[in-house]
Amino acid sequence: KKYRDGLLVGSACEAGELYQALLRNVPDQEIARLVNFYDYLEIQPLGNNAFMLADEKHDMINSEEDLKEINRKIVKLGEQFKKPVVATCDVHFMDPQDEVYRRIIMAGKGFEDADNQAPLYLRTTEEMLAEFEYLGSDKAEEVVITNTNKIADRIDVMAPVRPDKCPPVIPDSDKTLTDICYRRAHELYGDELPKIVEAVSYTHLRAHETGRNL
């Protein structure tokens, strides 16, 4: 709470405390306390949490219908406590085929289940509406489109760095860059430079135009 000012806090994925509390069937009073802490509640596509179907630790999750029921409970809690419910992808990579990179990273960290990747890619609006059609078309549109935009509208657009890039100013940096580029080009291709000269010139020009000096 000390650092809450200026932040919007969502209930997160299945690893979040609200989802975990629902899995444990904690008392309603505790659920209410958790819900009231958040600015908005989140639900994810079924595939994100399908790993629980084969996980003995989650004995109350035995089918996709059980996963749907958890999401329905979160939606009802949003209605009860006047909290917007937002359908999120819990994105870890852009496209479905990119899961291989996360697999490699997780395998390198020693995860035994690295090959069992959840579909944590960025879905389109149409894909998300299809994912939550079991909530009914109106509610699906509310959690996928309406509430998502409400949250987005509350977020200020800002950049962590200045727009002018603030490159360092170094005397003769343009000449230094040109000398380095052509010296390396001659080392690679000899005295007579082929069409690669055009590429070198273009690279140097773009670096100069964008202020990325040495």
Segments predicted by a language model, with ranges:
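Alpha-helix capping and helix-loop boundary segments enriched in small/acidic/polar residues
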Residues: 61-65, 116-119, 139, 172
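Histidine-centered active-site/metal-ligand motif
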Residues: 13, 92, 204
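Non-catalytic structural connector segments
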Residues: 45, 136-207, 212
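Phosphate/diphosphate-binding loops
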Residues: 107, 114-151
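Extended substrate/RNA-proximal surfaces in nucleic-acid metabolism proteins
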Residues: 1-80, 99-104, 143-146, 176-182
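Short acidic/histidine-rich active-site segments
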Residues: 84-96
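Catalytic nucleotidyl-transfer cores of nucleotide-processing enzymes
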Residues: 85, 101-103, 107-111
